[in-house]
Curated annotation (Swiss-Prot):
Cross-referenced NCBIfam families: PRK00957.1
HAMAP family, per the entry: MetE
Cofactor binding note from Swiss-Prot or TrEMBL: Binds 1 zinc ion per subunit.
InterPro entries xrefs: Met_Synth_C/arc (IPR002629), MetE_arc (IPR022921), UROD/MetE-like_sf (IPR038071)
Binding site for Zn(2+): 192, 194, 215, 282
UniProt function note: Catalyzes the transfer of a methyl group to L-homocysteine resulting in methionine formation. Can use methylcobalamin and methylcobinamide as methyl donors, but methylcobalamin is not considered to be the physiological substrate.
Protein name: Methionine synthase
Pathway: Amino-acid biosynthesis; L-methionine biosynthesis via de novo pathway
Cofactor(s) of this protein: Zn(2+)
Length: 308
């Protein structure tokens, strides 16, 4: 089975040298490059198959709103439009590091979904409120261009839409927004939705994505959805909300429980190793870095022990 991550990793900054400080004065110093290097090296060392760049430059919303027309921070002050690729530079840098360490490692592109971005901003201009369909679709159009910039460099792009588990956004609008992003592009898409999803799996199955990624370690009620999922499964198996590092045996037991339920799913083919990706429940940004690394390491070890 393939192992991956949801995205974010704890940010570690190195102590600045005199030369670094001089570069900073002239705008030539990137304080986040070391954090990307550490995130990549840790993920590769842990044995993860498909890594991320660590999403080190801010929270999942600010990374995008800080780099699109129409936003001033998390305030909407004009029509939302694409400016230039937002995550591509970090993806390419992370990929260059990873390939030197292990040529077989892949890296995923990650974007925050249009509904989740919309839910996190205050609308002051151009749109009625943060549930305005036009705002959501304009964000989706900008994200489409981001995806077009990424697709030549990654095998999979993940769309983070945690807000969908709250019921705050209309699913038809959300699906249309995702369609704007993915339609006609020859690349695999995953959609990450954390929280309780056992009451909305029928709606999530209708999204035009290849993989649905959910949390199962911190929310075992979600296990029931494995019987009715119609997409490949991103199986969150380590709890990213707590600092306790699960043992290899704990993680292995949960994955095996999920596999047993998946065996009853008549909508997926029976080659289960092709239908499940193993990952943490959510991003790991808020964890101590040693905890994050050891959770990933144990997750990979547990996965290797499982025979399907």
């Amino acid at each position: 089975m393939i192992t991956t991550v949801v995205g974010s990793y704890p940010v570690v900054k190195k102590e600045e040298t005199f030369l670094d400080k001089v570069k900073k004065v002239f705008g030539l110093y990137d304080e986040y490059k070391y954090a990307i290097e550490r995130a990549v090296k840790d993920q590769v060392k842990a044995g993860v198959n498909i890594i991320s760049d660590g999403q080190v430059r801010g929270d999942m919303v600010e990374i995008f709103t800080n780099n699109m027309y129409g936003f001033d921070g998390k305030r909407v002050v004009g029509r939302v439009e694409f400016i230039k690729p937002i995550t591509l530079k970090d993806i390419l840098y992370a990929k260059s590091i990873a390939k030197k360490l292990n040529p077989n490692v892949e890296i995923k592109g990650i974007i925050t979904g249009p509904c989740t971005i919309a839910s996190s901003v205050r609308v002051e201009s151009c749109y009625s409120d943060n549930r305005d369909e036009n705002l959501i679709y304009d964000i989706a159009k900008a994200l489409r261009k981001e995806v077009e910039a990424l697709k030549k460099h990654v095998p999979i792009i993940q769309i983070d839409e945690p807000i969908l588990s709250t019921g705050m956004y209309d699913f038809d609008v959300a699906r249309k927004a995702i369609d704007i992003i993915v339609d006609g592009l020859n690349i695999k898409f995953a959609m990450h939705v954390c929280g309780n999803v056992y009451n909305i799996i029928d709606e999530l199955n209708k999204f035009n994505v290849d993989i649905l990624d959910h949390e199962f370690a911190s929310n075992k009620k979600n296990l029931v959805i494995l019987e009715s999922m119609e997409k490949k499964v991103g199986f969150g198996c380590v709890n990213t909300k707590v600092k306790k590092v699960e043992s290899v045996e704990e993680i292995k037991s949960l994955i095996e429980e999920g596999i047993e339920i998946l065996k009853n799913n008549e909508k997926l083919n029976k080659n289960l190793s092709d239908n499940i990706l193993i990952d943490p429940d959510c991003g790991m940004r808020l964890l101590p870095i040693d905890v994050a690394f050891n959770k990933l390491k144990n997750m990979v070890e547990a996965t290797k022990l499982i025979k399907i």
